[in-house]
Design a protein with these regions (language model features):
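Long, charged, mostly alpha-helical binding arms that flank functional sites
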Residues: 1-69
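Basic, alpha-helical terminal appendages of large translation-related enzymes
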Residues: 43-156
Length: 156
């Protein structure tokens, strides 16, 4: 969004199928978490995130040279990102809070389950902005929201 949307959120709404997928994975996660099945709850989010990443890759590539299509791809991706960030927050709070911070949202609002099914525009409205006026925080190149555990770092 730094260059495509001038540092604000996409003004287009996510596609209906994206909103439905966000709702479906949120309900599945909640059912599994309620049954203390953390493994399958997180697996559901992982599968959703992989599908969203694939959708973003295909849509952003297809939208090259078409600003409206690219903004639509961003709108779909941001809606999915918000859902993944909300659902992964219990497992990886610090990384998810960095995502929230860079999206420019108040964490109490962003992680409030009363807003779990809100669109990006509805979250903006709850914070007193609109997608067109809601500024995001720029990212340096190759920024990683999630720190690696020492066991994940290769020893030379």
């Amino acid at each position: 969004t730094q260059s495509a949307c001038a540092g604000h959120l996409p003004t287009l709404a996510a596609h209906d199928d994206v909103m439905a997928a966000c709702r479906e994975v949120t309900l599945r996660f909640e059912r599994l978490a309620h049954g203390f099945d953390a493994h399958n709850a997180l697996a559901a989010v992982d599968a959703f995130a992989r599908a969203a990443n694939k959708r973003w890759g295909e849509a952003s590539k297809a939208a090259q040279g078409d600003d409206v299509a690219y903004e639509q791809a961003l709108a779909d991706a941001f809606q999915a990102l918000r859902t993944v960030t909300l659902l992964m927050h219990p497992a990886t709070p610090s990384g998810c809070e960095k995502v929230c911070e860079h999206l420019g949202f108040d964490s109490n609002l962003f992680f409030d389950w009363e807003h779990a099914f809100d669109s990006i525009a509805q979250l903006c409205q709850a914070q007193g902005t609109t997608p067109a006026t809601h500024q995001t925080v720029g990212l340096p190149p190759r920024f990683d929201f999630f720190e690696r555990h020492p066991s994940q770092i290769r020893q030379k």
